[in-house]
Regions:
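C-terminal non-catalytic regions of proteins with extracellular/luminal or membrane-system context
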Residues: 1-153
Length: 153
């Protein structure tokens, strides 16, 4: 399958969670929204990027849990999470002490170094459909997480 046609891990997890009756919102980053604008409107949107900042109550009043899927290209020359320029938006995990937050790393086992403030970190090692299915089953308590990450132990 051509990589461009493959579903993102976040889309697969969203479908699996919704099939179990959960309400799921996938955050579209500020940068992604700006890139979808007509080119003539992008400069003004970039100049206004800090207006995207919002109070923590906008998150705590609407969400019970944040599941942050980190999909870093493990074959790239730089294997780090790249935080967008927008400050105070859900793009950056500033909310980890106000909302239960789980980080799941797919493709790359070393993302914890970029998010040490997160209390729950899971290495899924890949974003394949069957791995995401097993992840959701484990999050639902249908089977136990076992083992210790050889990377972050």
């Amino acid at each position: 399958m051509i990589a461009g046609q493959k579903k993102r891990a976040s889309d697969v997890v969203k479908e699996l969670l919704e099939a179990r009756g959960h309400d799921v919102t996938v955050w579209e980053s500020t940068e992604e929204r700006i890139m979808q604008l007509p080119e003539s409107e992008r400069a003004a949107a970039i100049a206004n990027i800090y207006a995207q900042k919002q109070p923590i109550s906008n998150l705590t009043d609407h969400y019970d849990l944040i599941l942050n899927l980190v999909d870093v290209n493990s074959g790239g020359t730089v294997q780090r999470i790249v935080w967008p320029a927008a400050k105070g938006t859900p793009d950056q995990p500033f909310y980890v002490h106000e909302i239960p937050t789980i980080v799941v790393s797919v493709q790359h086992a070393f993302a914890l170094a970029d998010m040490p403030q997160v209390g729950t970190y899971i290495n899924a090692y890949d974003g394949k459909d069957n791995t995401m299915k097993a992840l959701v089953e484990k999050l639902a308590g249908e089977s136990n997480f076992t083992g210790v990450s050889p990377v972050d132990a």
